[in-house]
Amino acid sequence: MGYIPYVIENTDRGERSYDIYSRLLKDRIVLLSGEINDSVASSIVAQLLFLEAEDPEKDIGLYINSPGGVITSGLSIYDTMNFIRPDVSTICIGQAASMGAFLLSCGAKGKRFSLPHSRIMIHQPLGGAQGQASDIEIISNEIIRLKGLMNSILAQNSKQSLERIAKDTDRDFYMSALEAKEYGLIDKVLEKNVK
């Protein structure tokens, strides 16, 4: 990430400078931007856990603009979203592809949103393997297991059957925000912030 903007707040105790992400965190907004890897996932998980400790009853907003990334990294975010007590609302800004789309669909029911011109894409897990044939077989079996797990969760989160999810994720399956709503990955397309 390049330049990080700072904001200045005036309070009765004087001026306070925050990097923009810390300021958003004060409003219980977590930004998932870019490729999902272990480092990004650790940061997101830490922010979710921190916000739960601050107020276990108040919703958290997870804003997503991501092309996807490492499956296990994304699953650590998914598990944390389900583990913590606050509802996690998901909002797609720009794109939610692959693991980004998966996480978008995993927000609290009724609280999964997208901005109108965002793009959402689901597909099967990607992976590569090298080494001995037995090692490649082990990796292949793990990818197939993860594919089944993710398809099952997507089916639970959407209005689609497991068979339909398996068919649609066989290749890249792109949707507009409205199409993602009709598909059941999100609950509403947002035009304006109502806060």
Swiss-Prot record:
Record's InterPro entries? Answer: ClpP, ClpP/crotonase-like_dom_sf, ClpP/TepA, ClpP_His_AS, ClpP_Ser_AS
- Give the EC number: 3.4.21.92
Record field: catalytic activity: Hydrolysis of proteins to small peptides in the presence of ATP and magnesium. alpha-casein is the usual test substrate. In the absence of ATP, only oligopeptides shorter than five residues are hydrolyzed (such as succinyl-Leu-Tyr-|-NHMec, and Leu-Tyr-Leu-|-Tyr-Trp, in which cleavage of the -Tyr-|-Leu- and -Tyr-|-Trp bonds also occurs)
Q: Which GO terms describe its molecular function?
A: ATP-dependent peptidase activity; ATPase binding; serine-type endopeptidase activity
Keyword RNA-binding attributed: no
Catalytic site: S98 (nucleophile), H123
Kindly report, in one word, the top-level EC class recorded for this enzyme: hydrolase
Any GO CC annotation of this UniProt entry: endopeptidase Clp complex
Instruction: Supply one GO BP term.
Output: protein quality control for misfolded or incompletely synthesized proteins
Where does the record say this protein resides?
Cytoplasm
The question of whether Protease is a record keyword is answered with: yes
What are the UniProt keywords, alphabetically? Cytoplasm, Hydrolase, Protease, Serine protease
Which residue ranges traverse the bilayer?
none
Chain's role: Cleaves peptides in various proteins in a process that requires ATP hydrolysis. Has a chymotrypsin-like activity. Plays a major role in the degradation of misfolded proteins.
- How does the annotation summarize its subunit structure? Fourteen ClpP subunits assemble into 2 heptameric rings which stack back to back to give a disk-like structure with a central cavity, resembling the structure of eukaryotic proteasomes.
NCBIfam families associated with the record = clpP (TIGR00493), PRK00277.1 (NF001368), PRK12553.1 (NF009205)
Entry's family note = Belongs to the peptidase S14 family.
* Name by which UniProt lists this protein: ATP-dependent Clp protease proteolytic subunit
Organism this protein belongs to: Helicobacter acinonychis (strain Sheeba)
Where is the organism placed in the taxonomic lineage, from the top?
A: Bacteria, Pseudomonadati, Campylobacterota, Epsilonproteobacteria, Campylobacterales
